[in-house]
């Protein structure tokens, strides 16, 4: 835990003879399918989408391209074997949070080494070329925070609510009650931290140290006045920040539902993503998909 945690699921390893029974099991299937790294390897699920990665591209001012990010696809190694020569994009400016969230070829996968690309991907055809990175412990933490040196059985608590999320909720509220500058203040607190925080580095001490940046990182706060902007524009700015900051933390789908934009957003997403992910052809999201089915066991108990 740290000062940002508001509510988290507490886990542990190697306590009271429990082994990994109390460990963080929720993400054991989402560790990379990495046969050359048996201490790291998992099933390779929870892959970030092309659309999410594209969303981290920024303009010349380091601001998100909310309405146009999908017009330019960030360079990726889809359909390229790890044995084939390939270099990551070092020119397109991206928000530095990208490489703390997404594992991609040519960028340090925390301290596990450079991500090799397709060799660590379960099936690029089904889900693309990326691995999740947000819920991966460091290799140098294995002895302390993992069971039997197995990274996926670890003592990393799962944050259900953290302070950044509270700030962004507050920004949403300020937009709705007509205080746009206060909303900007809250959003800029998040963006300033991203600007002042550490960037993923190359070199012997990767991803930390003083080596060269692993990409052309650029991020800045909003400096224009939010007063006078329409609520539609303000909502887009706050919501986009929530997507970037809270990516892969399990909130975005439910945010889309509560904002009442799930059908519009997800159907546009399908149109973009199916260029690479063929099983999405013909997929349609409608209002009946917004809510989970009630389990039969719960229905039976309600009589």
Regions found by a protein language model. Name each.
Residues 1-25, 61-303:
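Acidic/polar-rich alpha-helix caps and helix-coil junctions
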Residues 25-59, 121-129:
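Short, cationic low-complexity segments
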